[in-house]
Design a protein with these regions (language model features):
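A conserved beta-strand->alpha-helix junction
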Residues: 15-22, 99-104, 108, 112-159, ...
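C-terminal, non-catalytic macromolecule-binding modules
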Residues: 20-26, 216-238
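Conserved helix-loop functional segments at active or binding sites
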Residues: 63-72, 93, 97-100, 143-147, ...
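ATP-dependent adenylation/pyrophosphate-handling site
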Residues: 72-78, 82-119
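Phosphate/ATP-binding catalytic cores across multiple sugar-kinase/actin-like superfamilies
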Residues: 50-75, 169-173
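A glycine-rich phosphate-binding loop feature that marks nucleotide/adenosyl-phosphate handling sites
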Residues: 71-84, 137-138, 186-188, 233-238
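Active-site adenylate/phosphate-handling loop in enzymes that bind or generate adenylated species
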Residues: 95, 125, 148-226
Length: 238
C-alpha cells in the first residue's frame, strides 16, 4: 500500500508465494549501501472477491486441521442438501478425492431425490459413496422406546433420533478406519439451534460453521462457475 492508501502490489492469498516490490521516489531510504532492484515487473496477483477468499480460507483451514491432527482421510454424511455438498467439495479440494468418503444414510422419510443428489455429487467429485439405510435401526429404536413413548404424538424427538443414528454411524466409521468426521452445519443453523446434539453435530471439524447460509449458496455458485459440480437440484432445493 502506498502513502495514499492504494494497493500497488499483492501476493497470492492462502498459499505460499514470493512477491518482489520495487520502491521508487525521493522518500525511499535504502540505508547504507545501494538498493538494487530488477526493473522487470513481477506478476501482480489479481484481487480476489469475498466469496473466493472465503472458499480458499475454508480449503486451507480444512487441509491444515486434518493434517496437523494426524488424520489422512475424512468422512462426510451426504444428505443431498447444499451444506453437505459444499462441505464435500471443500474436503476434496483440501485433501484430494481419494481421501474423502461420502456416506448417505436414507430413512423411510428420505426422498428419492435426496439420495440421487448425494450419489451424483459423489460421482462428479470422484469419491466413494456408501449408501447405508437406517430404517431398520430407526425402527428398532422406536420399538425399544414404544413403552415409555406410549400415548405421545410423533414430534421432533423421532426426527432427532434419525440424526443421532447417522451421527453414530459416522463415528463408528471414524473409529474403525481412522477417518476424521467433518460436520456440515452452517452458522445460521447453529445460531438458532437448528441442529441435533449428538447427531449432525458429531464430528471433529465443523467446516462451514462460521459462515451464514447465504454465503453457503454464494460458495455453491462459485464452485459451479465453470461446470456443474453441485447438482442444480441441490442448490434449488427449499
Amino acid at each position: 500500500i502506498n502513502k495514499k492508501g492504494i494497493v500497488v502490489d499483492r501476493a497470492s492469498g492462502f498459499k505460499e508465494d514470493l512477491l518482489m516490490v520495487e520502491f521508487k521516489g525521493p522518500d525511499v531510504n535504502a540505508g547504507e549501501g545501494k538498493l538494487r532492484t530488477d526493473k522487470k515487473r513481477i506478476r501482480y496477483a489479481a484481487s480476489e472477491g469475498n466469496v473466493e477468499s472465503v472458499y480458499k480460507a475454508l480449503v486451507l483451514g480444512t487441509r491444515d486441521y486434518v493434517k496437523k491432527c494426524g488424520f489422512k482421510k475424512a468422512v462426510i454424511g451426504l444428505s443431498g442438501g447444499i451444506d453437505s455438498a459444499v462441505t464435500a467439495v471443500i474436503a476434496v479440494k483440501a485433501l484430494g478425492r481419494g481421501k474423502v468418503l461420502g456416506v448417505t444414510m436414507p430413512s423411510s422419510f428420505s426422498s428419492k431425490g435426496s439420495i440421487e443428489d448425494s450419489v451424483v455429487l459423489a460421482e462428479k467429485l470422484g469419491i466413494d459413496c456408501q449408501v447405508i439405510p437406517i430404517k431398520s435401526i430407526y425402527n428398532a429404536y422406536t420399538k425399544t422406546l414404544s413403552g415409555i413413548f406410549a400415548g405421545l404424538p410423533f414430534d421432533v424427538t423421532e426426527e432427532n433420533l434419525q440424526a443421532r443414528i447417522r451421527g453414530k454411524i459416522l463415528m463408528a466409521i471414524s473409529n474403525k478406519h481412522g477417518y476424521l468426521v467433518l460436520t456440515t452445519g452452517n452458522k445460521s443453523e447453529l445460531a438458532v439451534g437448528y441442529c441435533t446434539l449428538y447427531g449432525d453435530m458429531c464430528g471433529g471439524l465443523a467446516v462451514i460453521s462460521d459462515i451464514p447460509k447465504t454465503m453457503v449458496y454464494d460458495i455453491a455458485e462459485y464452485i459451479n462457475r465453470r461446470k456443474e459440480i453441485i447438482p442444480v437440484d441441490t442448490i434449488e432445493k427449499p
